[in-house]
């Protein structure tokens, strides 16, 4: 896993809390995708399991460090869903918690990393909760999450929340400019599309992601003046439809911002398209379309086995209906 420079302040702050005896036994780390929370947790784990730490760092030479580097440390436990599953079950949690009651194999600390706490089943969360309420000595837990509110309230209450905030925007753009050759506007747009996460922004430039966004923008540039929104189906009906609907939603939001005179927009690399949307669609129509786009996106992400093509087709035909004169628009449900 890759270490990112913006992780250092958080790493040093957390290590200092352990050094001062104020480190919480269960740390709930909230971070956006691409922020590097996995690398932060791994670095903290290496520090806690190091037998001869040097300042804020693990030594890299002791038996504990060697085993961590080899991926075979007997006192380091990773809790993640089994391959092919999207939940973390109670059996895996119980297997680890039983081992935690034993003496540490290397005689030092024990560390447990829950890679995505939101995937814990209720039974698994309750099993983990029992251990968090009475943790074994020298045992540290790291729970990663995108949305803490999805966790059981009792589980959250036993943890200390640490939010891994995105770095300042200009810092992130500078970092991105060293990683990929793109215009400053494209870098800034990717960063804002990723809610400020530099790692997620970089991922947009990998594979065919950015080309897919450009294709969507080109299709939208045709559909807006022509009124043929159904022509967007090919650009949206894809296994990555939630991401593409997110791109569409940000363009609609930027057009709304333009109506209201807001200075900061997300899609700074396509100002002409944003202006076209604002010129052709009133604020009320933009709000109605935006509400439906967000609703469909949520359905695609939360309902298993849903017919994606049918759902998106219905969305696009409904948008065309909204453009007809005299149509009563729905109340926005954002």
Curated annotation (Swiss-Prot):
Under which EC number(s) is this enzyme classified? 2.7.7.7
Which UniProt keywords are present, listed alphabetically?
DNA replication, DNA-directed DNA polymerase, Nucleotidyltransferase, Transferase
Transmembrane feature ranges: none
InterPro entries, from UniProt?
Answer: DNA_pol3_clamp-load_cplx_C, DNA_pol_HolB, DNA_pol_III_delta_C, DNA_Rep/Repair_Clamp_Loader, HolB_lid-gammaproteobact, P-loop_NTPase
Pfam families from the UniProt entry: DNA_pol3_delta2, DNApol3-delta_C, HolB_lid
Question: Cellular component terms, GO, for this chain's entry?
Answer: DNA polymerase III complex; DNA polymerase III, clamp loader complex; replisome
Q: Which domain of life is it from?
A: Bacteria
**A biological process term (GO) from this entry:** DNA replication
Q: Which GO terms describe its molecular function?
A: 3'-5' exonuclease activity; DNA binding; DNA clamp loader activity; DNA-directed DNA polymerase activity
Its recorded reaction(s) are: DNA(n) + a 2'-deoxyribonucleoside 5'-triphosphate = DNA(n+1) + diphosphate
Function summary: Part of the beta sliding clamp loading complex, which hydrolyzes ATP to load the beta clamp onto primed DNA to form the DNA replication pre-initiation complex. DNA polymerase III is a complex, multichain enzyme responsible for most of the replicative synthesis in bacteria. This DNA polymerase also exhibits 3' to 5' exonuclease activity. The gamma complex (gamma(3),delta,delta') is thought to load beta dimers onto DNA by binding ATP which alters the complex's conformation so it can bind beta sliding clamp dimers and open them at one interface.
Q: Which PANTHER family match?
A: DNA POLYMERASE III SUBUNIT DELTA (PTHR11669:SF8), REPLICATION FACTOR C / DNA POLYMERASE III GAMMA-TAU SUBUNIT (PTHR11669)
Q: How does it assemble?
A: The DNA polymerase III holoenzyme complex contains at least 10 different subunits organized into 3 functionally essential subassemblies: the Pol III core, the beta sliding clamp processivity factor and the clamp-loading complex. The Pol III core (subunits alpha, epsilon and theta) contains the polymerase and the 3'-5' exonuclease proofreading activities. The polymerase is tethered to the template via the dimeric beta sliding clamp processivity factor.
Full protein name: DNA polymerase III subunit delta'
Q: Which organism is it from?
A: Escherichia coli (strain K12)
């Amino acid at each position: 896993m890759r270490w990112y420079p913006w992780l250092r302040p958080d790493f040093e702050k957390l290590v200092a809390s352990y050094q001062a005896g104020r480190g919480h036994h269960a740390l709930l780390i909230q971070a956006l995708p691409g922020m590097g929370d996995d690398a932060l947790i791994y670095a903290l784990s290496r520090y806690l399991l190091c037998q001869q730490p040097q300042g804020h760092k693990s030594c890299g030479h002791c038996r504990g460090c060697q085993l961590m580097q080899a991926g075979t440390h007997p006192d380091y436990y990773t809790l993640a869903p089994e391959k092919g599953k999207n939940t973390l079950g109670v059996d895996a949690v119980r297997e680890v918690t039983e081992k935690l009651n034993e003496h540490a194999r290397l005689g030092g600390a024990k560390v447990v990393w829950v890679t995505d706490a939101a995937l814990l089943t209720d039974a698994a969360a309750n099993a983990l909760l029992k251990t968090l309420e009475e943790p074994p000595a020298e045992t540290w837990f790291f729970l990663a999450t995108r949305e803490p509110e999805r966790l059981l309230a009792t589980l959250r209450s036993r943890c200390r929340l640490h939010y891994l905030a995105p770095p300042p925007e200009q810092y992130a753009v500078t970092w991105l400019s060293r990683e990929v050759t793109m215009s400053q506007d494209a870098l800034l747009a990717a960063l804002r599309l990723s809610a400020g996460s530099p790692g997620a922004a970089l991922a947009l430039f990998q594979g065919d992601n950015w080309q897919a966004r450009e294709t969507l923008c080109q299709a939208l540039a045709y559909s807006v003046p022509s009124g043929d929104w159904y022509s967007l189906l090919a650009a949206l009906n894809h296994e990555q439809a939630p991401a593409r609907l997110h791109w569409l939603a940000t363009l609609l939001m930027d057009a709304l911002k333009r109506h209201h005179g807001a200075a900061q927009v997300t899609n700074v690399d396509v100002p002409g398209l944003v202006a076209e949307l604002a010129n052709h669609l009133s604020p009320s129509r933009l709000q109605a379309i935006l509400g439906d786009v967000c609703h469909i996106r949520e359905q695609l992400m939360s309902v298993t086995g849903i017919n994606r093509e049918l759902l998106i087709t219905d969305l696009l035909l409904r948008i065309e209906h909204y453009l007809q004169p005299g149509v009563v628009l729905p109340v926005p449900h954002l």
